[in-house]
């Protein structure tokens, strides 16, 4: 069974948690800038994402790679093993070819990684029957151009009714759009034990700690547009609020890889959806005094039971 989330490869591992291997792990930005020379698959039983990353690093060493980037992980069969896919890079890796953004009706189409870095000045919304995505883009860009936009990013596209009509909303930007103040979604929580230790250490370690109140690149701007049209959630980490008011937050894989768990849990049950699974994890995490958790594995047992394992953090 696939893991809950596609792996967003971790930033450089904390020296507190892992030993250093010869092959280093690249950040998503670094990996996107160069060409890999090979892609490998590593399988094994790993109790945490950090163990999987170290196994990939050892494989990269054997292949003569200077660095690597974990592309994906998944459960391998029903054995509880992981299947980890990674790209390998030479020290003198060629630079990746830069791709230019499409221009439609004179308006530049932005990918998400570029759109989240700048502030839109307005939104446009169109609704109708569109037979293809090019027709959608044509309608959106005409509306954007009418408002004097230089570029656009489609933030919401849904079926409006049972008749095949769609409703599409896009952020629109000026050429000299103001840059947003943002941080990575993979930073260490500032009020966690790992966060306090990193801040005390200072230097590069402190740079991996979140800045409270600063938006992340995982979410677009909330400065313009109507919330239901532009925001899929309130932003920030997924948080479970228990009946007694206790809040427990879920960490993504990249953040968890930079922290050291103080405990772990494993349980099985029949759960209808991931919201229920998250609640069950958070409930058990809170009983052990955890403020954060990271689901490491999920796999289907016989029948409809799901087994879940998670690391816990203070």
Curated annotation (Swiss-Prot):
GO biological process, one term: response to stress
Signal sequence segment: 1-19
Keyword Signal attributed: yes
Gene3D superfamilies named among the record's database cross-references: Flavin-binding protein dodecin
Keywords carried by this UniProt record: Signal
InterPro entries according to UniProt: BhsA/McbA_stress_biofilm_assoc (IPR051096), Dodecin-like (IPR025543), YdgH (IPR025539), YdgH-like_sf (IPR036275), YdgH/BhsA/McbA-like_dom (IPR010854)
Disulfide topology: none
Residues spanning the membrane: none
PANTHER family named among the record's database cross-references: OUTER MEMBRANE PROTEIN-RELATED-RELATED, PROTEIN YDGH
Family to which this protein belongs: To E.coli YjfY.
Name this protein carries in UniProt: Protein YdgH
Biological classification of the source: Bacteria, Pseudomonadati, Pseudomonadota, Gammaproteobacteria, Enterobacterales
Gene: ydgH
């Amino acid at each position: 069974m696939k893991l809950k989330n596609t792996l967003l490869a971790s930033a450089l591992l904390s020296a507190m948690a892992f030993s250093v291997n010869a092959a280093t792990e690249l950040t998503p930005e670094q990996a996107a800038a160069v060409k890999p020379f090979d892609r490998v698959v590593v399988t094994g039983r790993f109790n945490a994402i950090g163990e999987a990353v170290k196994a990939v690093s050892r494989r990269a060493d054997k292949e003569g790679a200077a660095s690597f980037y974990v592309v994906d992980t998944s459960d391998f069969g029903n054995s509880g093993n992981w299947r980890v896919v990674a790209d390998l890079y030479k020290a003198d890796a060629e630079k990746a070819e830069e791709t230019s953004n499409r221009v439609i009706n004179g308006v530049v189409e932005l990918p998400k990684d570029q759109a989240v870095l700048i502030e839109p000045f307005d939104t446009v919304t169109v609704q109708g029957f569109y037979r293809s995505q090019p027709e959608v883009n044509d309608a959106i860009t005409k509306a954007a151009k009418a408002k004097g936009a230089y570029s656009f990013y489609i933030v919401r596209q849904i079926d409006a009714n049972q008749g095949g009509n769609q409703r599409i909303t896009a952020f629109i930007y000026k050429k000299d759009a103001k840059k947003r103040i943002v941080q990575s979604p993979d930073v260490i929580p500032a009020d966690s034990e790992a966060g306090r230790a990193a801040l005390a250490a200072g230097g590069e370690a402190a740079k991996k700690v979140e800045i409270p109140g600063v938006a992340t690149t995982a979410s677009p701007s909330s400065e313009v547009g109507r919330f239901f049209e532009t925001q899929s959630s309130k932003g920030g980490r997924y948080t479970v609020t228990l009946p007694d008011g206790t809040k427990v937050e879920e960490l993504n894989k990249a953040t968890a890889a930079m922290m050291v768990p103080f405990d772990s849990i494993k349980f099985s049950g029949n759960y209808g959806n991931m919201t229920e699974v998250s609640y069950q994890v958070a409930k058990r995490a809170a009983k052990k005094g955890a403020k954060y958790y990271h689901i490491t594995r999920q796999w289907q047992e016989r029948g409809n039971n799901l087994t879940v394992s998670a690391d816990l953090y203070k």
